[in-house]
A protein has these predicted regions:
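Rhodanese-like catalytic fold shared by cysteine-dependent sulfurtransferases
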Residues: 1-29, 36-67, 78-120
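Residue-level detector of alpha-helix initiation sites
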Residues: 73-76
Length: 120
């Protein structure tokens, strides 16, 4: 049974907020898959924004051969995005706990206009 479960729900690498920030600083793409209103309220500096529902059509917008760190508010939508990207052969890591964990770690959150943001 565990073999079937691992094939149905393969584990994706996960990162803490601090690890994700370090990967981003080393050149990984931090991909925020939340909706537009969530993004505008607050996101990680330097993140790219492609809502989960648009990701299948926009995967080509992501540079190949770069690690992608997926993030949403809590980690669930980003896990779906990570699975989708992994099926396409991308090197992908899911930010465990999402933007909630990012903010709890004291990492910066900026609003759509560039000022201080909040996780929505």
């Amino acid at each position: 049974m565990s073999g079937l479960l691992s094939r149905l729900f393969p584990q994706r690498p996960k990162a803490t907020a601090e690890q994700a920030r370090q990967l981003q600083q080393q050149g990984a793409i931090l991909l925020d898959v939340r909706e537009d209103t969530e993004w505008r309220a607050g996101h990680a500096p330097g993140a790219r924004h492609i809502p989960l529902r648009r990701l299948p059509a926009r995967m080509k917008d992501l540079p190949p051969r770069r690690t992608v760190i997926t993030v949403c508010r809590s980690g669930h939508r980003s896990a779906q995005a990570a699975a989708l990207l992994a099926r396409e052969g991308r090197d992908v890591v899911n930010l465990s706990g999402g933007m909630n964990a990012w903010a709890r770690a004291g990492l910066p959150v900026v609003a759509g206009g560039g000022g201080p943001g909040r996780v929505a």
